Curated annotation (Swiss-Prot):
Taxonomic placement: Eukaryota, Metazoa, Ecdysozoa, Nematoda, Chromadorea
Quaternary assembly: Interacts (via BTB domain) with cul-3. Seems to be a component of a E3 ubiquitin-protein ligase complex containing cul-3. Interacts (probably via MATH domain) with mei-1, which targets mei-1 for ubiquitin-mediated proteolysis. Interacts (probably via MATH domain) with ppfr-1, the regulatory subunit of the PP4 complex; targets ppfr-1 for ubiquitin-mediated proteolysis. May interact (via MATH domain) with unc-89 (via Ig-like C2-type domain 2/3 and, Ig-like C2-type domain 50 and fibronectin type-III domain 2).
GO MF, one annotated term: protein kinase binding
Protein name, as recorded: Protein maternal effect lethal 26
Gene that encodes the chain: mel-26
The species this protein was found in: Caenorhabditis elegans
Pathway where this protein functions: Protein modification; protein ubiquitination
Length: 395
């Protein structure tokens, strides 16, 4: 049961929040604001000795916070036997804001708490009154609970902590215009400079006697093949910080390493797209390989269709392979007269089978090409003795 607190006048209160809105209730576009409630902390320790011999109605002490010319004051009162006949079995600790008559009264928001301790600095548990009628803050404890804890030294230590909301400040921030930046482009330029100026290089690639200097970390980060080569300390390349390439042209490897650094090609790849695709496949540079494959697909012609079909098959470039087959089927008489067709006949007969399979698929779907799409119609294919009859669809 809560003890009753008799009489008195409530003093103090909570200050305004200081929130501000635009006249239409919506912040202006591009403008932001910030509200800060400044809080100052007040701490005070009050020691009372021979507490059991306190016979007056209450003990009083004061806590101060100086702010410029203004001094904020709080009264701390200890009621050894309550403040009335109805609660004489309780000890009260009360806190009140004291209004100075010489200072303009204003609402100051604050939060407070009491901590009661013994002479041995052990906490004494108190209860907080939920709705005091005569004070801003009240804690209480029964006398028969308190006194056994403070004996035999008969001393209490009262710690009061007050958090005071002294000021509310709202600031408005005008938008600041920054020049747009292109961090991706800047990154490319930085890595291009790192490569072209050979800054802090720790690795060399010897291509037929010509040196390309690079950085192990960059190569390992971009290529799984380089990663495996350079992170295993027992490889020759990791030990010597040098690798040798004798089966590819210097220009192709230089372009490949440039792409590793910059994510784009340094120059026109017309004369090296096929070789660059092969290099990208070897070092598992999927982006570069896809870039080369796209270029070759867009530049397929009668003279290179067969060789690109072989490249697409050997180096797992499915889009290039498919485009080459489609191109050959659309121009069989022209394509089969090229040296590339001879290469297919001699070294890659499996591709002939794939071409006929494509004819069969076109027949079953009703698609048309320059090659007869009717099953059982003989076709004269250069390099193959006799007439080749594609199998009927559905078998």
């Amino acid at each position: 049961m809560e003890p009753r607190i008799d009489g008195g006048v409530f003093i103090g209160g909570i200050g305004n929040s200081g929130n501000e809105m635009c006249s239409n209730g919506v912040p202006a576009l591009g403008v932001s604001s910030q509200t800060e409630i400044k809080v100052e902390k007040v701490q005070h320790t009050w020691t009372v000795k021979n507490f059991s011999h306190c016979y007056q109605e209450y003990l009083e002490n004061f806590v101060y916070l100086q702010r410029g010319d203004e001094q904020l004051t709080w009264s701390i009162k200890i009621y050894p036997k309550g403040n009335g006949e109805n609660n004489k079995d309780f000890v009260f600790l009360c806190l009140n804001r004291v209004i100075n008559n010489n200072v303009k009264a204003g609402k100051i928001g604050f939060k407070s708490q009491f901590k009661l301790r013994t002479a041995e600095n052990k906490d004494i548990e108190m209860r907080i009154h939920p709705n005091p009628s005569h004070s801003d803050y009240v804690s209480y404890i029964k006398r028969d609970v308190l006194f056994p804890q403070i004996m035999p030294r008969d001393m209490i230590i009262v710690n009061v902590e007050i958090d005071v909301a002294v000021e509310t400040i709202t600031t408005t921030n005008e938008p600041i215009q920054f020049e747009p930046t292109n961090s991706e482009q800047q990154l490319i330029e930085d890595y291009q400079r790192l490569f072209s100026q050979e800054l802090l290089c720790d690795f060399a690639i010897n291509v037929n006697g010509k040196i390309i200097r690079a950085h192990k970390a960059v190569l390992a980060a971009r290529s799984p093949v380089f990663n495996a080569m350079l992170t295993h300390q027992d490889t020759d390349e990791a030990k010597s910080s040098m690798m040798y390439i004798n089966d590819m042209d210097y220009d192709v490897i230089y372009e490949m390493v440039y792409y590793i650094y910059c994510g784009r090609c340094n120059k026109d790849i017309t004369d090296m797209a096929t070789a660059l695709l092969i290099a990208a496949d070897k070092y598992r540079l999927e982006e570069l390989k896809s870039h080369c494959e796209k270029y070759l697909v867009e530049n397929i012609n009668i003279e290179n269709a067969c060789s690109l079909l072989i490249i697409g098959d050997l180096y797992s470039a499915p889009k290039l392979r498919k485009r080459a087959v489609t191109y050959i089927l659309a121009r069989p008489k022209n394509v089969t007269g090229t040296p590339g067709w001879e290469d297919i006949l001699k070294g890659h007969p499996n591709l002939i089978t794939d071409i006929f399979s494509q004819i069969d698929r076109q027949s079953s779907t009703g698609a048309t090409s320059s090659v007869s799409n009717l099953p059982g119609v003989p076709m004269d294919i250069p390099g193959i003795t006799g007439n080749i009859v594609p199998p009927p669809s559905g078998l």
